[in-house]
Amino acid sequence: MNVLKEVYATIEKRIEEKPEGSYVAKLTTDDKKTAVNKICEKVGEEAAEVIIAAKDNDKAEIIYESADLIFHTMVLLAKSGITYEELSEEFKKRMK
């Protein structure tokens, strides 16, 4: 299993099970609209940090902040009921 798929599965599990102390559970426990708004704020914040790191030409920081951006985007997708497989299918369509 690839690491992104593993992370996505963990996110889905934490949204479902809401374990105490879980960052994902904390982000996603509110009603859907409030949770999505919180997650969108994080996605925007992380996107800005990727942009700053890229403009600074800081490779390590670009990698670090990109991982945060991808993670929070995955939380948003999972909270929206989108599966890893659905996302993968969309990428496959675009490879043609």
Swiss-Prot record:
Enzyme class: hydrolase
Annotated GO biological process: L-histidine biosynthetic process
InterPro entries noted in UniProt: HisE, PRib-ATP_PPHydrolase-like
Cross-referenced SUPFAM superfamilies: all-alpha NTP pyrophosphatases
A GO cellular component entry from the record: cytoplasm
EC number: 3.6.1.31
Principal location: cytoplasm
Keywords: Amino-acid biosynthesis, ATP-binding, Cytoplasm, Histidine biosynthesis, Hydrolase, Nucleotide-binding
Signal peptide: none
Subcellular location: Cytoplasm
Keyword Nucleotide-binding assigned: yes
Signal found in the keyword field: no
Pathway entry: Amino-acid biosynthesis; L-histidine biosynthesis; L-histidine from 5-phospho-alpha-D-ribose 1-diphosphate: step 2/9
Pfam families for this protein: PRA-PH
Reactions that this protein is recorded to catalyse: 1-(5-phospho-beta-D-ribosyl)-ATP + H2O = 1-(5-phospho-beta-D-ribosyl)-5'-AMP + diphosphate + H(+)
GO molecular function, one term: ATP binding
Family to which this protein belongs: Belongs to the PRA-PH family.
PANTHER family cross-referenced by the UniProt entry: HISTIDINE BIOSYNTHESIS BIFUNCTIONAL PROTEIN, HISTIDINE BIOSYNTHESIS BIFUNCTIONAL PROTEIN HISIE
Protein name: Phosphoribosyl-ATP pyrophosphatase
